Design a protein with these regions (language model features):
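Active-site loop-to-helix "anion-binding N-cap" substructures in soluble metabolic enzymes
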Residues: 1-165
Length: 165
């Protein structure tokens, strides 16, 4: 039987106390045999949430990463830093990153190439086929049999409307 894949993106919705409480409660979920659960807390609490969930089958993932590596990039978090705290997957191309932070398809595609050439996994979000860089994906799919890529259809026209996508 296939597992149901559930990703909880906590965004910036919870303070530290509520984040830690939620992590402890999620850890108590029973009957996870058919579930693949991943949570994406704010980057400020990633390490603590990962520590709480380390002995469970719940994965902690990053909401975003900076395409630069270590250096003078105020406010960024790079793949090496994520790996240091045990994070091995990230979300990329989320509609809020595109709209609120003006991340362009070009920037997102640059980040996608970086992560596809790393040993981290990625959830690539898109709301139209025009946002999917098939050329990048096909090249990397051919060259990397260990590639772990999840495509997440996120139709912005349906978010918060009650309409089914």
């Amino acid at each position: 039987m296939k597992k149901l894949h559930i990703v909880g993106n906590w965004k910036m919705s919870l303070n530290k106390e509520d984040s830690l409480k939620l992590a402890h409660n999620i850890k108590l979920i029973n009957n996870k045999d058919n579930l693949n659960i991943e949570v994406a807390p704010t980057s400020l609490y990633l390490a603590e949430i990962a520590e709480i969930l380390q002995d469970s089958d719940i994965s902690v993932i990053s909401q975003n990463f900076d395409f630069q590596n270590l250096g003078s990039f105020t406010g960024g978090i790079c793949l090496d830093q994520l790996k240091e705290i045990g994070i091995n997957k990230t979300i990329l191309g989320h509609s809020e990153r595109r709209s609120n932070f003006n991340e362009s398809n070009e920037q997102i595609n640059n980040k996608l190439e970086i992560i596809l050439n790393s040993d981290l996994d990625v959830i690539f979000c898109f709301d139209s086929l025009e946002q999917v860089p098939f050329d990048i994906l096909s090249t990397n799919l051919k060259d990397n049999s260990k590639l772990k890529l999840t495509l997440a259809y996120e139709p912005t026209w349906a978010i918060g409307t009650g309409k089914t996508a």
